Each structure stands twice: as C-alpha cells, then as structure tokens.
Design a protein with these regions (language model features):
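Short active-site oxyanion
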Residues: 16-17, 74-77, 96-98
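Short, solvent-exposed amphipathic alpha-helices that sit
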Residues: 27-38
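C-terminal binding/interaction regions
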Residues: 2-6, 10-13, 18-27, 105-163
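Short, structured active-site "lid" loops
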Residues: 60-79, 83
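Short, high-confidence coil segments that cap the C-terminus of an alpha-helix
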Residues: 42, 73-75, 116
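Residues that form or flank phosphate/diphosphate-binding pockets in enzymes
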Residues: 27-28, 56, 86, 130
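A short beta-strand-loop structural module common to alpha/beta enzyme folds
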Residues: 43-55
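Mid-chain, well-packed structural core segment of small domains
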Residues: 79-125
C-alpha cells in the first residue's frame, strides 16, 4: 500500500488526537476533549478551536485539524459542527485525509477497519452526547490492518488524489 498520502497510524500505543469544532459543536467538543484527555489510549489531545465566544467558520478549523493528521503531527482528528457534514467535507479537501460523518457504531467501526478514516465527525444537533461518547470510545479501540482486504481499496482512493 502507498503510504505517501497520509502519515501512517501506529498499530499499537496511545493516539495523538486533535479536536476542533465551530460554535455549533462547542459543547460536545469540550466534553469529548475531556474524555479523550482522561483515556489511556490517548497520548495527547490538541484543540484547534473554537473556544467560547469565538466564531470561526468550520472549514478553517476542519482543515487545520486535517493538516495536522496529514503531516503526521496527530494520528486522528475528532470534529464537531451542527451536522458533522461541513467539517467532513472540509477535512476531505486535505490530501491523504479520509474523514467521515458517522452517528452509529457500525459506521464508526467500519470507517477505520474498512476505510482507514483518520477523522471522525459528529453533528451536535444530530446525536446525543452520551451516544457521541460511546462512539468515540469505540473509535479509539479500532486500528486499520494494512494487510486486510481493504488495504488495496484504501490505496486506490489515495491513487485518485494523484491523478
């Protein structure tokens, strides 16, 4: 598999996670950031915004988080906006990034296991906080297997970025 399109994720060990949101996702981002910081599967958590009272358009926050992952400064990103859609679309503009909006356990698991998605996006207006917490917990437990049948498909996705 071609690994030049994104920084490889470690097979084991704690993850470096970047979090971000717009003002519509601030409450969930703050709660999930605290959960991540307390989780032994997470080595570091970086917050790229927004903070209380800030009004930064979601594309700027999502792209900053995605760039950190693509450059290898973080392993994964968790983004929250009103629907989870805008931040996913924005993050996917960064070469090598596979961002998904997922609001159910199966999709969260498959996003990593089948698609090697490094960025998980939620909509604060779409799901409850306890479900978001459960999904983040499940997400942290998943690792992509570079030897899986999905690896060839993920490599094909990366190939389209260069064509």
């Amino acid at each position: 598999m071609d690994t030049t399109t994104a920084a490889p994720q470690p097979d084991h060990g704690p993850l470096r996670v970047v979090v971000g949101c717009d003002d519509a996702g601030l409450d969930y981002k703050e709660a999930l950031k605290r959960d991540l910081a307390a989780d032994p599967r997470v080595a570091e958590v970086w917050d790229v915004g927004v903070g209380t009272g800030e009004h930064v358009a979601y594309p700027h926050v999502a792209v900053e988080a995605a760039r950190r992952v693509a450059e290898g400064r973080a392993d994964r990103a968790l983004l929250v906006c009103g629907t989870g859609l805008g931040v996913a679309i924005s993050a996917n503009k960064v070469p090598g990034i596979r961002a998904v909006t997922a609001h159910d356990s199966y999709s969260v698991r498959r996003s990593v296991l089948s698609n090697n998605a490094q960025v998980l996006c939620f909509g604060q207006r779409v799901i409850g906080l306890e479900l978001a917490r459960t999904l983040v917990d499940e997400w942290l437990g998943q690792r992509f297997d570079e030897r899986s049948a999905s690896a060839e498909k993920v490599a094909a996705i990366g190939g389209y970025e260069r064509s």
